[in-house]
């Protein structure tokens, strides 16, 4: 019985709003104004540190796993484009890099910054003139895991821009997105 009452109350609220009888309705052509401003803001990158055993393990993971990856090995498939009609190597760089940016955000250092700078610089160097960054040859674009991999490239580039404000990464991400839209088309 209670779910039925809640459902009816919800339908009544929707009907009242649709009829314009709600006092909280904002006319369609007028922007809504904020009555209450956000009081909660995220802490700046690097401002929160975890201590103790867990903090030590996090630091070890960041230093010895995330920042110790072989960048050349992660970027090489973007140069060689070996995936053809099968493969999903294009996701590896983006997944690793997004995690590396989280690690850098948690424990920013000059050494970590050099690692992520090098990784993004080397990946962006593989961008073709039309904007594509991926591991598939031209004849296999949009096939198999190509779009999936491009998504991870975009996430990595945007994570880098979010923390560093380096516009080259944002521009590379825009070109990747524009290329995908041009290939896949609207809709």
Task: State what each model feature region is.
Residues 1-4:
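Positively charged n-region of N-terminal signal peptides that target proteins for export
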Residues 84-98, 111-114, 118, 144-155, ...:
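Aromatic- and histidine-enriched alpha-helix N-cap/loop-to-helix transition segments
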Residues 48, 52-56, 95-110, 152-167:
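Well-ordered alpha-helical scaffold segments within catalytic/enzyme domains
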Residues 137-187:
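A conserved hydrophobic secondary-structure block that centers on an alpha-helix together
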Residues 20-92, 110-135:
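Low-complexity, Ser/Thr/Pro/Gly-enriched N-terminal "stalk/linker" regions
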Residues 7-15:
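Bacterial N-terminal signal peptides
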């Amino acid at each position: 019985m209670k779910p039925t009452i809640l459902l009816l109350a919800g339908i009544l609220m929707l009907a009242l709003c649709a009829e314009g009888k709600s006092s909280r309705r904002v006319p369609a052509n007028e922007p809504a104004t904020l009555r209450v401003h956000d009081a909660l803001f995220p802490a700046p990158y690097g401002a929160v540190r975890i201590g103790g055993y867990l903090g030590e393990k996090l630091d070890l993971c960041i230093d010895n796993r995330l920042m110790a990856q072989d960048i050349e090995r992660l970027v090489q498939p973007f140069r060689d484009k070996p995936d053809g009609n099968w493969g999903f190597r294009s996701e590896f760089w983006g997944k690793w890099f997004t995690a590396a940016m989280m690690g850098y955000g948690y424990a920013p250092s000059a050494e970590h910054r050099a690692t992520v700078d090098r990784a993004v610089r080397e990946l962006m160097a593989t961008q073709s003139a039309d904007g594509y960054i991926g591991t598939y040859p031209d004849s296999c674009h949009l096939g198999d895991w190509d779009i999936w991999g491009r998504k991870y490239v975009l996430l990595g580039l945007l994570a880098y821009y979010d923390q560093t404000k380096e516009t080259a990464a944002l521009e590379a991400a825009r070109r990747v997105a524009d290329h995908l839209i041009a290939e896949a088309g609207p809709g």
